A protein has these predicted regions:
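Conserved acidic E/D residue at the C-terminus of a beta-strand in Rossmann-like folds
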Residues: 215, 283, 308
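Glycine-rich cofactor phosphate-binding loops and adjacent beta1-alpha1 units
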Residues: 179-182, 206, 222, 226-303, ...
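C-terminal substrate-binding/catalytic core of Rossmann-like NAD(P)-dependent dehydrogenases/reductases
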Residues: 241-246, 286-334, 342-343, 349-354
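NAD(P)H dinucleotide-binding glycine-rich loop of Rossmann-like/cofactor-binding domains
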Residues: 67-74, 79, 109-190
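Mid-domain Rossmann-like dinucleotide-binding core that forms the NAD(H)/NADP(H) cofactor-binding site
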Residues: 141, 156-238, 242
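Glycine-rich beta-strand-centered segment in the early N-terminal region that forms part
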Residues: 31-45, 60-113, 155-157
Length: 362
């Protein structure tokens, strides 16, 4: 059976040639559909903090004297995207033209040790959408999903304001799950950006004893309260350590989830957390972070846990967005056409108070 569906030969695409050279191409070649591939017409793509840090030249992406470059230019950025199936290879089964779908950011190999034991999000050789030229991302009119892509179907009536948040909310869910929250825990979430808000609305479903949110922007803290925070504090306006210790008989919080990528937030977490507490880190850092490891080991014997991507999270996120359990209203603050990508990247920095900025396609 031949390839089903058709697409034009060229498309609009934002292409990263280097950290200082991002260009909107108006006639970039569309992806070719192999026998195991699915091509979607992109509806929208969110701009992530990782996209910003990549464009700003963070060493973890472009390398430095210590580490090699990880990205593979020229590539099309964007991993928070979804779209409608417009073309499918002859071997593809279980999907139909016109269905709305999205996929995990990681493209696992399916063969390595981690993939075989079910930890596909930690795939050793893995590819990632939006950073490599053989897995181009969603800031283009068309995107190719390969055979090992982890695809999830979206309801036809799911609005952009929810569909564009499935990927970041999947990451939020995984981070909260790593914390293993119980109803006896005092939980602190540092950061009320998109990821932090996703963590707050999901953590509320865990019914912790108290859910405390920290952020330097008061408008984000107001939204955090609407999403389920019991208490909010601005570290720039109060002594967070004093406030949290006062609420916990001087012990500190049971769980601290770091969602800012700011070194000061890491140090803050090690201060406000109690002995034998659980510290979860989910952030991309733009620079090195130094902490006193004696706090982690000798003084507090902390349980330090990382959180990476959004494994097995999409079905839950999609269902609970649609039924209203996961709040999304107010997270997407700006929707712009791809032609205004420079404005979008600028606003995504939060300088005008924006949260999630999304690029939309016709």
């Amino acid at each position: 059976m031949p390839v089903r569906g058709s697409i034009p030969k060229t498309m609009k695409a934002l292409v990263a040639y280097s950290k200082d050279d991002y260009r909107l191409e108006l006639a970039y070649p569309t992806p070719e559909c192999g026998p195991d591939d699915i091509i979607i017409k992109t509806e929208a793509c969110g701009i992530c903090a990782g996209d910003l840090k990549c464009k700003h030249g963070a060493a973890m992406f472009w390398g430095d004297d210590i580490q090699p470059s990880w990205v593979k230019p020229p590539f099309i950025p964007g991993h928070e995207f979804y779209g409608t199936i417009v073309q499918m290879g002859e071997n593809v089964e279980g999907y139909e033209l016109g269905e709305k779908i999205t996929a995990d950011q990681i493209v696992p190999c399916g063969k390595c040790r981690f993939c075989k034991d079910g930890h596909y999000w930690m795939c050793q050789p893995h590819d990632m959408y939006g950073f490599m030229n053989y897995t181009n991302g969603g800031m283009a009119e068309y995107v190719r999903y390969g055979k090992t892509s982890v695809i999830s179907k979206l309801p036809k009536d799911m609005p952009l304001e929810q569909a564009a948040l499935v990927e970041p909310y999947g990451c939020s869910k995984h981070a909260v799950d790593r914390a293993e929250i119980t109803n006896e825990d005092v939980v602190v979430i540092s950061g009320a950006g998109t990821l932090g808000l996703g963590m707050i609305t999901y953590a509320r479903m865990k019914n912790p004893k108290k859910l405390i949110v920290l952020d330097m922007q008061d408008n984000r803290l107001e939204l955090a309260k609407k999403f389920g925070a019991d208490l909010v504090f601005n570290p720039g306006k109060c002594d967070v350590d004093k406030e949290i210790k006062a609420l916990t008989d001087g012990y500190g919080c049971d769980i601290y989830i770091e969602a800012t990528g700011n070194p000061a937030s890491v140090v803050q977490g090690l201060t406000v957390i109690r002995k034998l507490g659980t510290f979860v880190e989910f952030s991309v850092f733009g620079k090195e972070t130094t902490v006193d490891w004696s706090i982690i080991g000798d003084r507090k014997e902390l349980d330090i846990r990382g959180a990476h991507l959004s494994p097995y999270a999409y079905p839950f996120v999609i269902e609970n967005m649609m039924n209203g359990n996961l709040k999304t209203e107010g997270v997407i603050t700006r929707i712009l056409p791809i032609e205004e990508w420079e404005k979008g990247f600028d606003l995504a920095s939060g300088r005008e108070g924006d949260l999630k900025v999304v690029l939309k396609f016709d």
